[in-house]
UniProtKB/Swiss-Prot annotation:
Heterotetramer of 2 NUBP1 and 2 NUBP2 chains. Interacts with KIFC1. Interacts with NUBP1. InterPro entries: Mrp-like_CS (IPR000808), Mrp/NBP35_ATP-bd (IPR019591), NUBP2/Cfd1_eukaryotes (IPR028600), P-loop_NTPase (IPR027417), YlxH/NBP35 (IPR033756). Its cofactor is [4Fe-4S] cluster. Widely expressed with highest expression in skeletal muscle. ATP binds at G22, K23, G24, G25, V26, G27, K28, S29. This is Cytosolic Fe-S cluster assembly factor NUBP2. GO terms for cellular component: centriole; cilium; cytosol; nucleoplasm; spindle pole centrosome. It comes from the Eukaryota. One of its GO terms (biological process) is iron-sulfur cluster assembly. Binds 4 [4Fe-4S] clusters per heterotetramer. Contains two stable clusters in the N-termini of NUBP1 and two labile, bridging clusters between subunits of the NUBP1-NUBP2 heterotetramer. Component of the cytosolic iron-sulfur (Fe/S) protein assembly (CIA) machinery. Required for maturation of extramitochondrial Fe-S proteins. The NUBP1-NUBP2 heterotetramer forms a Fe-S scaffold complex, mediating the de novo assembly of an Fe-S cluster and its transfer to target apoproteins. Negatively regulates cilium formation and structure. It is found in: Nucleus; Cytoplasm, Cytoskeleton, Microtubule organizing center, Centrosome; Cytoplasm; Cytoplasm, Cytoskeleton, Cilium axoneme.
Length: 271
């Protein structure tokens, strides 16, 4: 596909947030999805850019599998997820013939697609663009940061789980952010205990507090802990809106609190 005829498709995006994790399996895409939904329910217009090219799970989480991406006069039109067009999504998952098709590409081709996603998706006016990145640190992260740098991203959320091995990976992720000049907005600890679906009591499954302790040691904000919640897992599998359907759950309280902290940390120029 040729480059968009008119550059500057991110000109109408007020704030860009990258979501990172030091390793796979910590629920990074879950946090990206639910953060976007929470911001949307807070009255913001939100886009999600899924650059996790080898594991594009967000279309399924949002019930958008099988949707088609169309060309417009400015490049690609994102997939809108509601009638009001208040939340939109772009993912490599929309470009695959089958949802479970493997992306077997070398680095240069991946980097080229990331740059094309940044330049050619016609987002229009957005309050927030949430960028879901691959796990770890790689050329794809560098390509994403370099492509977004002219638009001055608000910063990065780093997702971890309570286990020491995950916390150790996050240390490397924080170092990566410092070396690339990417501000760390805060750390989110996911899978922090299990919420019983009957009594809503939260029981520790792994160790607890590793994310908060790491945030204190690194001198970055700790944004909150999100418990394992069967209702959250079910809505992700079914492509439903957890924030809308389970407003009384502990996971809802945690996710909306994180979103509010993001809103509070946003410069006052955003209405």
């Amino acid at each position: 596909m040729e480059a968009a005829a008119e550059p500057g498709n991110l000109a109408g995006v007020r704030h860009i947030i990258l979501v990172l994790s030091g390793k796979g399996g910590v629920g990074k895409s879950t946090i990206s999805t639910e953060l976007a939904l929470a911001l949307r329910h807070a009255g913001k217009k939100v886009g999600i850019l899924d650059v996790d090219l080898c594991g594009p799970s967000i279309p399924r989480m949002l019930g958008a599998q099988g949707r088609a991406v169309h060309q417009c006069d400015r490049g690609w039109a994102p997939v809108f997820l509601d009638r009001e067009q208040s939340i939109s999504l772009m993912s490599v998952g929309f470009l695959l013939e089958k949802p479970d098709e493997a992306v077997v590409w070398r680095g240069p081709k991946k980097n080229a697609l990331i740059k094309q996603f940044v330049s050619d998706v016609a987002w229009g006016e957005l309050d927030y663009l949430v960028v879901d990145t691959p796990p770890g640190t790689s050329d794809e992260h560098m390509a994403t940061i370099e492509a977004l740098r002219p638009y001055q991203p608000l910063g990065a959320l780093v997702v971890t789980t309570p286990q020491a091995v995950s916390v150790g990976d996050v240390r490397r992720e924080l170092t990566f952010c410092r070396k690339t000049g990417l501000r760390v907005m805060g750390i989110v600890e996911n899978m922090s205990g299990f919420t019983c679906p009957h009594c809503t009591e939260c029981t520790s499954v792994f160790s607890r507090g590793g994310g908060e302790e790491l945030a204190q040691l690194a001198g970055v904000p700790f944004l909150g802990s999100v418990p394992l919640d069967p209702a959250l897992m079910r809505t992700l599998e079914e492509g439903h809106d957890f924030i809308q359907e389970f407003p009384g759950s502990p996971a809802f309280a945690a996710l909306t609190s994180i979103a509010q902290k993001i809103l509070d940390a946003t410069p006052a120029c955003l209405p």
